[in-house]
């Protein structure tokens, strides 16, 4: 156990639960319902546009309410398709609410960290009920003492307000005694680091060339390519 660290904040999407797998499944079914032909390469467009929108949310340029109206309108436009983007967003969220595909070794590492007596907290951007239901469906919710989701916190990662909302639940715990673990360099790593937390970047893609995005490894305190590597840190 790392005696310096007391509280672990773990991102959900593409850290504990495979958002990409769930989103591709949901997109396929959404297209089927809308009478559109889905091809796997279309998911690449969804990922690109979805990531751009979330980046703007993280920068404070868009809100979660904006996401509801613009995500599928934008994706459909880039695919050259016509459909009701708002209705597709509703169906996509309904399906995503049901999606709970664990990232490899996620449950094992949660069990390990729980036995090490760390205080485990989920820290995620997104709709509260959706994220809680997905953790519950994956049998992961039981490991967390707190679940901080942006919709309920009232602020998004990487804002200081989000981390303020988390830390107010802990009396006598310093940011330096906390670690933020996640796949996003902006929301998780930059957000945690700016708040004074230790950080661990999980490269969900497993692409070791991704370290080049991390300023030669100088942004995050730790970089891992598999969740099991946390055992070498904590």
Residues of each region from the PLM?
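Short glycine/serine/threonine/alanine-rich loop segments
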Residues: 36, 118, 197
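Catalytic-core regions built around general acid/base machinery
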Residues: 105-117
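Asp-based, Mg2+/Mn2+-dependent phosphohydrolase catalytic module
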Residues: 1-8, 21, 83, 111-114, ...
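N-terminal helical cap/lid subdomain that shapes the substrate entry/recognition surface
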Residues: 2-104
